[in-house]
């Protein structure tokens, strides 16, 4: 279990029912990570907490987001992606109501619509949402969302499977989950992805692995075909979401937070 799962498990197991205590936990979590973070009360359909970070707020005020609750997502998520998000939230709410033991590693990829002063043209920003449901013994449940920038354009809602060979993709039309097989990457392809930072560094990768530029280019073409992505940056993000290979940012974050895994706070 990584530090994030360990931290949210403390919230679930703590026996704390008061919302302020849960928010206090999440404020500490927000300080530990560079990403945006929000806590959504899925029963009352409102935000309990939003980290004051512009990535998630997209230029809107904290007060506006807290006032609008669920409706705030209509302000920041691309209109083409919004129906998927709403359908996923509805499905997750039903799942948590029916199964108190439900816990899955959910994540979503959406286009956000940041609002900038003096720019009238609508801009898109691809984002990754780590989605963690937290269910209290009282039956009340929350959704912790951790939002960061992404190079991956595979818009959708996903959850990692029990096996490292599969994941599940949410189908909003059928309102259900469908198993997808994770493409099998060769050892050499994984080595390339482990050190890849962009297409312009193929010569660097070739030198690092003592292979020719054309051999590396052939492997990269195979990676893009298997993962159905456009470039190496998108590929490295996608495989980190599926836990095929941790991204350097995730490794650095986990190592920097390892000393806080046993964190507790005064409940009084």
Stretches found by the model and what they are:
Residues 199-234:
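Recognition helix of helix-turn-helix DNA-binding domains
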Residues 188-192:
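The N-cap/first-turn positions of alpha helices
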Residues 14-72, 165-178:
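PAS-family sensory domain signal
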Residues 129-143, 150-157:
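Short loop/turn elements at sensory-signaling interfaces that couple input to output
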